[in-house]
A protein has these predicted regions:
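Juxtamembrane intracellular "pre-TM" segments in multi-pass secondary transporters
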Residues: 20-50
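A late C-terminal transmembrane helix in Major Facilitator Superfamily
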Residues: 158-196, 200-203
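C-terminal membrane-cytosol helix-exit motif in multi-pass small-molecule transporters
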Residues: 2, 7-27, 213-217
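Extracytoplasmic gate region of multi-pass secondary transporters
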Residues: 43-85, 89-92, 106
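Helix-to-loop junctions at the C-terminal end of transmembrane segments
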Residues: 93-106, 190-191
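Multi-pass alpha-helical transporter architecture, strongest
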Residues: 17-18, 201-229
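A membrane-interface helix-boundary motif in multi-pass transporters
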Residues: 1-8, 76, 188-208
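C-terminal transmembrane helical hairpin of 12-TM major facilitator-type secondary transporters
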Residues: 106-152
């Protein structure tokens, strides 16, 4: 039933895209050569690295939320769908809120997303003893990180120049790397005996790692602007 439900949502999404998106003019100046030149763009690669590292914490927690709740919190297996729904709700609301702040200042919005996400993991690790606080913490984890994807996508469009298509596709690849890397680190630490909360602490480190890379991107950008003057 889960697959049929997912397929139904996918079909409704296709219908919404067909009737809801405005028609856009094709960019006839786009070319494969221009796209490939984007591979030399340092800012594009650094921004992609922010997503590949900074978003990994969510996947570290999401991949092991079921055993964390059942083995550490000692919750019933029946609550897992509600926990996942709580995470999904946080992603929806968080994306809307982050978009509002991005309209005011994109770079500051990305910084605050990563900082607040790191704090949410700390709160989550300290809140998993009780089911109610665990649900709240899981919501905050997804709420705080939800905006990172679209915010980085927007920044990529700003720095990619004529390689817009390449940047957009690589952004998805970066988040797939985050998916694999976060889940791997969380699982590896559990296998090494660091306990069920280890994936949550991985989230703290990865969010801060993404923040450090972002600050490096800003510094590199300032140097590039100064060099052009």
């Amino acid at each position: 039933a889960g697959f049929e439900f997912s397929a139904s949502i996918a079909f409704l999404t296709v219908v919404a895209i067909c009737f809801g998106l405005p028609k856009m003019q094709l960019d006839h100046t786009a070319s494969i050569q221009n796209e490939l030149r984007g591979l030399k763009n340092t800012q594009m690669w650094i921004t992609l690295a922010v997503g590949a590292i900074g978003f990994g914490g969510l996947f570290s927690v999401y991949s092991y939320v079921s055993p964390i709740l059942t083995e550490y919190t000692h919750a019933s297996i029946q609550v897992i769908p509600f926990a996942l729904a709580c995470i999904g709700l946080g992603l929806v609301i968080g994306g809307l809120v982050a978009g509002h702040f991005a309209d005011k200042n994109l770079n500051k919005a990305i910084i605050w997303v990563l900082v607040s996400n790191a704090c949410s993991y700390v709160l989550c690790a300290l809140s998993m003893d009780h089911l109610a606080t665990a649900f709240i913490a899981l919501f905050l984890v997804s709420f705080s990180i939800a905006g990172l994807g679209p915010l980085l996508q927007t920044r990529l469009m700003d720095v990619a120049g004529n390689a817009q298509g390449l940047a957009a596709s690589l952004n998805h690849s970066a988040f797939n790397i985050a998916n694999a890397f976060g889940a791997f680190l969380g699982g590896w630490l559990i296998s090494q005996g660091f306990g069920w909360l280890a994936p949550i602490w991985v989230g703290v480190l990865l969010s801060l790692g993404g923040l450090m890379i972002l600050l490096l991107a800003f510094q590199h950008e300032k140097k590039s602007i100064s060099a052009c003057k």
